[in-house]
Amino acid sequence: MSHFYDLAPKDKDGNPFPFSNLKGKVVLVVNTASKCGFTPQYKGLEALYQKYKDRGFIILGFPCNQFGNQEPGSDEEIAQFCQKNYGVTFPVLAKINVNGDNVDPVYQFLKSQKKQLGLERIKWNFEKFLVNRQGQVIERYSSISKPEHLENDIESVL
């Protein structure tokens, strides 16, 4: 993949979700899990989404079960959990791998664009990548970075 907009992961129903439809938007990509100590970040992520969605901002959640088996459910169960417990309205796509031999092309691309502490691999759930309106990865945040602490960076690219 040579560009963010060439990517087309699957949505929770198994249909393509072409990133070409995101051209001109600011995108926050997050690998998520329902049974993680960071799971309450869904609330903050949804607050960010509600605050900025009308200004061309979108969050994409990518469930992943690679860290402590903290996302064991089906795509439908995950979507229901997010909506019921955190009122999530931003897209939560199909479960993927973010590391290893079967890494999803989305994360292969993101990690190649922005390393963290000199490493490409994702260390845990709820790492975040901020992508500007031109499809460039401009920032990567660790799991401990709370969504509300990303506001200045988001504002700067909206």
Swiss-Prot record:
The keyword Plastid does not apply. Transmembrane segments: none annotated. It comes from Schizosaccharomyces pombe (strain 972 / ATCC 24843). The lineage of its organism: Eukaryota, Fungi, Dikarya, Ascomycota, Taphrinomycotina. One of its GO terms (biological process) is cellular detoxification of hydrogen peroxide. Gene3D superfamilies: Glutaredoxin. PANTHER family: GLUTATHIONE PEROXIDASE (PTHR11592:SF78). One of its GO terms (molecular function) is thioredoxin peroxidase activity. The active site is a conserved redox-active cysteine residue, the peroxidatic cysteine (C(P)), which makes the nucleophilic attack on the peroxide substrate. The peroxide oxidizes the C(P)-SH to cysteine sulfenic acid (C(P)-SOH), which then reacts with another cysteine residue, the resolving cysteine (C(R)), to form a disulfide bridge. The disulfide is subsequently reduced by an appropriate electron donor to complete the catalytic cycle. In this atypical 2-Cys peroxiredoxin, C(R) is present in the same subunit to form an intramolecular disulfide. GO terms for cellular component: cytoplasm; cytosol; mitochondrion; nucleus. Signal peptide: none annotated. Its EC number is 1.11.1.24. The active site is at C36. Induction: By oxidative, osmo- and heat stress. Keywords: Antioxidant, Cytoplasm, Disulfide bond, Mitochondrion, Oxidoreductase, Peroxidase, Redox-active center, Stress response. It is found in: Cytoplasm; Mitochondrion. The gene is gpx1. Glutathione peroxidase-like protein that protects cells during oxidative stress. Has peroxidase activity reducing hydrogen peroxide, alkyl and phospholipid hydroperoxides using preferentially thioredoxin as a reducing power. May act as a scavenger of H(2)O(2). It catalyses: a hydroperoxide + [thioredoxin]-dithiol = an alcohol + [thioredoxin]-disulfide + H2O. The keyword rRNA processing does not apply. Pfam families: GSHPx. Belongs to the glutathione peroxidase family. Monomer. Its main location: cytoplasm. CDD domains: GSH_Peroxidase. This is Glutathione peroxidase-like peroxiredoxin gpx1. Disulfide bonds join C36-C82.
